[in-house]
From Swiss-Prot:
Disulfide bonds join 288-354, 317-386, 321-388. Residues 274-284 have a biased composition (Basic residues). This is Growth/differentiation factor 2. Transmembrane segments: none annotated. The gene is gdf2. Residues 263-284 are annotated as: Disordered.
Length: 389
């Protein structure tokens, strides 16, 4: 009898050890499956990022109407006006530009400068190239005024500046007055003159290059304009234009394709019942949200032609649309119904997708063939809000 009891005790101990080992193996197997699943999710996230960067590069060039990446051999110093313009658009979301494309063309050559008494004439050569699919809205000639304080002061500081378009007809030079003004403030500053009419003629005639004559009349010999070709105070033509192509419609089509692609990626993840419990436990940490996705132009080899910004946060939408859908993810009615169906029968409907619901614009300053351009890219460049759809 004692032997039978002892045997039963040994058998119960062995059974408990075996049972605990089996449970431990089952737990290890579940943990292993969970780790493997997490690795697949991380690999999928990496593929999404690479896919996004590829899409972003193509879309970026298309928005700028560039057939390829500009091959710039040297950095160009942007004119001060272009720097200020970019900073205003980049820092103030409510600052709406009058044109979506602004280009600067620095004076190519000073053909001559002649001083006769109290009058000085400067003949300037500009080479302005604007794509045919853009419409010129306005053009400024910006001149930096120089007051020579070391020279004797005049009783009456008076200076007038007139700007002319130079036209040649049968070897005859004809001057057409474009703009002019009197300058009385004795400080070094930028003065802007309207030369829209002349540059439009250059553009429509497809010759691109044109000459502008600047005449300075002063009451004393203490005033001039900066014509240095070595720094960013040189004379510069600023062209404001609108892109008349179907860029905006095409951009929205691309965004819709991106949304569909994200939906397909989520939809391809078949809802498996044994994953559903683990996902539910992690719902609070993996809920639909906007996360950072920084694009550094140096990292992708674009810093030679992108002047500013050096990087920007495009953001992305990550996570899953778990029940209940809260107001902060602004769910559509269809997403709410789809989530309820998925909750009751995961095989019947996938979960709603976490996608961008609002996109914001950015301003970009870049150089192409030595020309500095500021472009305001509308509504398609970075995620502002995410939601369940």
């Amino acid at each position: 009898m004692w032997r039978v009891g002892h045997l039963l005790l040994l058998m119960s101990i062995v059974f408990r050890i075996t049972e605990e080992k089996s449970l431990g193996d089952a737990g290890s197997l579940e943990d292993s499956m969970f780790i493997q699943e997490q690795k697949l999710v991380e690999d999928d996230d990496l593929n999404k990022v690479e896919s996004f960067l590829g899409f972003m590069k193509e879309d970026f060039l298309r928005k700028l109407n560039l057939s390829g990446v500009p091959q710039e051999h040297r950095k160009v110093q942007p004119p001060q006006f272009m720097i200020e313009l970019y900073n205003r658009y980049a820092s103030d979301k409510n600052s709406i530009p009058r044109s979506d494309v602004i280009r600067s063309f620095v004076v190519q050559d000073v053909i001559y400068s002649i001083r006769q008494g109290n009058k000085t004439q400067h003949r300037l050569l500009f080479n302005v190239s604007i794509p045919n699919h853009e419409e010129i809205t306005s053009v400024q000639l910006r001149l930096f005024t120089l007051w020579h304080r070391h020279k004797p002061a005049c009783d009456d500081l008076f200076t007038s500046i007139n700007v002319y378009d130079v036209e040649y007809e049968q070897n005859a030079k004809i001057l057409h007055l474009l703009d002019g003004r009197d300058v009385r403030e004795s400080i070094n500053t930028w003065e802007a003159f309207d030369v829209t009419g002349a540059v439009r003629i250059w553009h429509e005639s497809r010759r691109g290059a044109g000459e502008i004559q600047v005449e300075v009349q002063h009451s004393c010999d203490s005033f001039d304009i900066s014509l240095s070709l070595e720094d960013n105070s040189s004379a510069v033509v600023i062209v404001f234009s609108d892109d008349l192509g179907n860029r905006k419609e095409e951009s929205m089509r691309k965004v819709k394709e991106m949304l569909v692609r994200e939906q397909q990626q989520v939809g391809n993840q078949a809802p498996v019942s044994n994953r559903h419990r683990r996902r539910k436990r992690k719902a609070k940490n993996n809920y639909c949200r906007r996360t950072s996705l920084k694009v550094n132009f140096k990292d992708i080899g674009w810093d030679k032609w992108i002047v500013a910004p050096p990087e920007y946060d495009a953001y992305e939408c990550k996570g899953v649309c778990y029940f209940p859908l809260t107001d902060d993810v602004s769910p559509s009615r269809h997403a709410v119904i789809q989530t309820l169906v998925n909750l009751s029968n995961p095989k019947k409907a996938n979960m709603a997708c976490c996608v961008p619901t609002k996109l914001d614009p950015i301003a970009v300053m870049y150089q192409e063939k030595g020309v500095i351009t500021v472009r305001h890219l509308y509504e398609e460049m970075k995620v502002a809000k995410c939601g369940c759809r």
